[in-house]
Amino acid sequence: MSGKITDFFEKKTTTTIDEAENKDNDKELTSTTTTTTTTSTTSKKKVAAAPKKKAAVASKKRKHESSDEETDKEEQQNDDDDDGEEKVENNNNNKKLKNEEKSEEINSTITDNNYYDDIENYFTDKQWKEALSGEFGKAYFKKMITQLNKRYSSKEKPIYPPKNEIFSAFNYAHLEDVKVVIIGQDPYHGKGQAHGLSFSVKKGVSPPPSLINIYKELETDIEGFKRPLKNGFLEPWARQGVFLLNAVLTVEEATPNSHKDFGWADFTDAVLKILSKQDQPIVFILWGGFAQKKEKLFTNKNHLVLKSGHPSPLSIKHFIGCKHFSKSNEFLKSKGIEEIDWKITE
């Protein structure tokens, strides 16, 4: 921009000077023509005056050039100032963007950490919380909780059980008081069913098919057991030391096994290893091929492992008649441990 302004001033100045010189020359010619009768002395004065006029014009031209140079310098300085201000503004904007990005990253971390703290606080039993503290700090667990946080927050598809009931199985009995472990695959995926205990449903929810078959087996296995028609809430078992653990602790609505790759298997395998190391005798009940793959985790000979088909209607013939409930009580009694009252009332 400064170059264009300078060219304009130079052209304008040159034109003005040329016009001045032409006017002076015209005056001289006119003067010479009209004063033919004037004395030679007067002509000499006019000739002597001409160099003075030219000198004045030249001086005027130099002033214009000097003014143009100063204008160029001022414009260049202004351009430099503008560039400097623009650089400062860009630097400030970059710093602002970096600070905003860092703030977002920190906020994201805080959100994840707060959720992680909440999850840990869902363990109300101190023994379990202490026993699993090493798992809480592992990368797979943090990644899993972060992923679950996004799924629960998005609300695109309901996740079961509710977040505060994921670890319900750990809060009914101390680690040292566990007597029987019944392993399920993943939670019920219907609305209002799952609440953190394998095979159990919430109060007021009718028993699902697998639980109905469990009740049928109890009717033939445990004397005096009467099958409840409308109650599938197995909390009374959990309070006596029956650890109802699903291998995968969360699921999307209407999508069984949808969270099987989240990392839950690593966590629940760690739980089963902890149980296997316990000195008190425990009965591990494995229904179906999925649960029976966990048998390799139980290396302590103090424990009893019972296996059969799954109580699902698809494999009922391999389940009915297993008598796992009476066998569990017989084992506990032989070890001097109080038996389980399997009764569930309406």
From Swiss-Prot:
GO molecular function: any one?
Answer: uracil DNA N-glycosylase activity
Q: What keywords sit in the KW lines?
A: DNA damage, DNA repair, Hydrolase, Mitochondrion, Nucleus
The terms describing its cellular component in GO are: mitochondrion; nucleus
**Regions of compositional bias (Low complexity) in chain numbering:** 30-42
Output the NCBIfam families linked to this UniProt entry.
Answer: PRK05254.1-1, PRK05254.1-2, PRK05254.1-4, PRK05254.1-5, ung
Family to which this protein belongs: Belongs to the uracil-DNA glycosylase (UDG) superfamily. UNG family.
* Designated name of the protein: Uracil-DNA glycosylase
